[in-house]
Amino acid sequence: MSDSKSSIIDSHCHIVFSNFNEDREKVAERWRSQGVKALLHACVEPSEIPAIKSMADQFQELRYSVGVHPLDAHHWGPETLSVLKNAALDDSRVVAIGELGLDLFKAENLSEQLSILMPQLNLAFELKLPVIVHCRDAAKEMLEVFTKLSEHGCCPKGVMHCWSGNVKEMKEFLDLGFYISFSGNVTFKNAIDIHECAKKVPQSRFLVETDSPFL
């Protein structure tokens, strides 16, 4: 039996966040020693992009997305879509659009969140890039959006990040072609629905993430 470690991909992290300013190099040493071969940094708002790009220069394992998080909808402006598009076209290390989505757990501004979600989904479809989806207490609303886009043949594929839904919801997203990514919440003792999802998701659609520094 081989002694080599399996390759691990962290499908969602925020390594540029200030939480890592004191020990980022040591964190990199740890992920390398644990067999992490690639990391995907999820952008949450446009002002992050230069720092993420610089971080990708420093750490060759890093790839990244560009996008606006639903809880950062207030950062959206007239030029935002152009900024995201240009950033995606200018760097081949941009491999996704996001972190986009809906969050009705921490906010109730559904119409504002939808107003920045749709342009990003359209951009992803135009550029043929997958999306990184943040969906918290909003599975019904998110499924409605994706189902309508799918009916019109313009629904991008992607990953449901930090999955926290139930099996029924998961199957609906799987039917739309999405991957399911599990984070530290799958270890929570009372996260029964997430445990069941982790058991039932097809291996070919199963991703893992740290969502660092959060989980």
Language model regions located:
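Mid-domain alpha/beta scaffold segments of enzyme catalytic cores
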Residues: M1-L215
